[in-house]
């Protein structure tokens, strides 16, 4: 097994010299600005997406307790 460390060094060599490309991040303003109505609709959909399932679970909490105890 004395040949294992040189083989491992050969496998690790390409890792040292890999070139990682820069991320292409642009900070330009939006091409079409978002209206207040679009923002309101988006926020209400996000809030409803979180609150409706949570409310459903909380309203059925007693039935969950009964079914797990049986």
Swiss-Prot record:
It holds the Pfam family COX8. Residues 60-70 are mitochondrial intermembrane. GO terms for cellular component: mitochondrial inner membrane; mitochondrion; respiratory chain complex IV. One of its GO terms (biological process) is response to xenobiotic stimulus. It comes from the Eukaryota. It is found in: Mitochondrion inner membrane. Keywords: Membrane, Mitochondrion, Mitochondrion inner membrane, Transit peptide, Transmembrane, Transmembrane helix. Residues 1-24 form a transit peptide. Belongs to the cytochrome c oxidase VIII family. Component of the cytochrome c oxidase (complex IV, CIV), a multisubunit enzyme composed of 14 subunits. The complex is composed of a catalytic core of 3 subunits MT-CO1, MT-CO2 and MT-CO3, encoded in the mitochondrial DNA, and 11 supernumerary subunits COX4I, COX5A, COX5B, COX6A, COX6B, COX6C, COX7A, COX7B, COX7C, COX8 and NDUFA4, which are encoded in the nuclear genome. Component of the cytochrome c oxidase, the last enzyme in the mitochondrial electron transport chain which drives oxidative phosphorylation. The respiratory chain contains 3 multisubunit complexes succinate dehydrogenase (complex II, CII), ubiquinol-cytochrome c oxidoreductase (cytochrome b-c1 complex, complex III, CIII) and cytochrome c oxidase (complex IV, CIV), that cooperate to transfer electrons derived from NADH and succinate to molecular oxygen, creating an electrochemical gradient over the inner membrane that drives transmembrane transport and the ATP synthase. This is Cytochrome c oxidase subunit 8B, mitochondrial. The gene is Cox8b.
